[in-house]
Amino acid sequence: MSEHRPSLRRLDYHYIAMQAGFWAMFAAVVAYQTALLLERGFSNSEAGLMTAVRCLAGIVCQPLLGGFADRHPQIPLKHIVSLSLLLSVAAGAWYWLSPGMGLWETTLVWVIIGGLEVSAYPLMDAMAVQFINEGMPIRYSLGRGIGSLAYAVVCVVLGFQASSLGMESTLLTHLGLVLAEALLVATYPAYRGKIRRPGEDGPKPQSALSLLRSNPRFTLMLAGVFLGLTGIMPLSNFLVNIVTSRGGTESDLGIALFLMGASELPTAFFFQKLLRRLGSGKLLLMSMIFGTLKGVLLLCTFNCLGVLAVQPIQVLGYGLFTPASVYFVNESVPAADRVRGQTVMMVASNGLGGMMGGVLAGWTLDLGGVNLMLAACIASGCAGALLCLAALRLSRGKRNQLV
């Protein structure tokens, strides 16, 4: 690291603020995506298609952004992320100003938002990991927990906002939050440590395919995460359908989203202890098991109160997944491939998993309603958990430990 490296306090608190900002803007556009599309007259299948489009755009853009960052380490990651966010603002403004846009225009908007805004998250992770690997103990799990709280607060506020001002008003809030996040990212200290220059000796970044072929344990875990998130993501992306099927309203949806997000906050306080005790791989498996169990409990509910009561299980489900996945990647792939590894994990989980979850949810909702959707999600989650268990049984071999 440079002699003039930024203080730990600034790196830590600034990164926590970035996490809060990201999950606040994420809540404003993604948590209410299905509700907004239904409000604009789209069907469940079309809403599921838009969710799939958003995730597919991330699948394409995340490896491209990660690969570009690996090939051009002299370009600070914050410049790539902030530019991506500003381009997403332009698409979001168009979406807000054109409430009557058709299917194709709507698809294009979600391609841009999914490809540039949501895809910025793994590069934000990498911004912190660069300093963590230099011995700076940035509290990643606390940042993720505060992000969950921000998500929860924005969800409940937007629930009441949608009830009083209309669902379309949430788009304006989203634009303001993205601009604030772009400012936070742009002002984060740039990494000034030793970076590999083109032509220097040392390990070179692999392609995504080469990375998967050379690391079967990592690849099998990705497959399990993909199937697990295919079953878990619809439980939040289509929560509006679950709430209304149990007699709830838009305000109830906001409360449910608040409870879901707030339940992830306690993870920040016990994650490091669990990590030392169990390891990142077992924590990933645990997150798949409890995420699937949430679907089982939702299937057993009969009213909106039951849906609200189930949400705290998120603490051991998706609340564990995000920090555990970051540590698992950092421990499982070579140092030169860690940025790409984070993007590949994001592609398999929120990308492919979210895409297939959207298709699965939209199709089953139109075919047989909420209960059929929940049954399909449970089946996919169980398959994912079994693959994660199989990955843990593979020989660990030589691993790269988190410094």
PLM regions and their residue ranges:
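Juxtamembrane intracellular "pre-TM" segments in multi-pass secondary transporters
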Residues: 2-9, 188-223
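Cytoplasmic helix-loop-helix junction between adjacent transmembrane helices
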Residues: 111-146
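Helix-to-loop junctions at the C-terminal end of transmembrane segments
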Residues: 60-74, 162, 267-279, 365-366
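Helix-loop boundary and gating motifs at the non-cytosolic
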Residues: 5-55, 217-256
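A late C-terminal transmembrane helix in Major Facilitator Superfamily
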Residues: 339-367
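Structural signature of the two symmetry-related core transmembrane helices
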Residues: 78-93, 282-297
